[in-house]
Regions:
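GST-like fold's C-terminal all-alpha helical module
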Residues: 5-98, 102
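Active-site cradle of extracellular carbohydrate-active enzymes
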Residues: 2
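Acidic/histidine-enriched, glycine/proline-rich intrinsically disordered or flexible terminal extensions
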Residues: 106-132
Length: 132
């Protein structure tokens, strides 16, 4: 399940982010491709979580690695509608020791993204990286 994140969710969500939020041109077929594939992978996780409390059976690095991407689904434009198992797991992950502290390293992006001016600055800086 860690490899599922490394070879599936990580790359697909990363590209969904780039093309949905940061790429200078909006290329809808590309955006759709990455968002739809991310959604399909979310459905795989949702099915796995229908019979397991944690992705690999017991709480593990697989949960942490996958959660880092699942929790950003809105930012990437990926719907979690109808994925109750995945949504419950995502919310339960916030309660795990160290998770709230960890997502604030190196900066508290969730706070930044709540402020429109800070959000614009964050996107502008990310777009600079995409253009390189």
């Amino acid at each position: 399940w860690l490899m599922f994140q490394m070879g599936g969710i990580g790359p697909m969500m990363g590209q969904a982010n780039v093309f949905f939020r940061y790429f200078p041109e909006k290329i809808q077929p590309v955006i759709d491709r990455y968002q739809n594939e991310s959604r399909r992978l979310f459905e795989v996780l949702d099915k796995q979580l229908s019979t397991n409390e944690w992705i690999a059976g017991e709480y593990s690095i697989a949960d942490i690695a996958n959660w880092c991407w699942v929790r950003t689904h809105n930012w990437s434009g990926v719907s979690m509608d109808g994925l109750e198992n995945l949504d419950n797991w995502k919310n339960k992950m916030y309660e795990q020791p160290g998770m709230l502290k960890g997502i604030k390293v190196p900066v508290d992006r969730e706070s930044i993204l709540k402020n429109d001016e800070d959000k614009k600055e964050f996107i502008k800086n990310a777009q600079k990286m995409v253009k390189k």
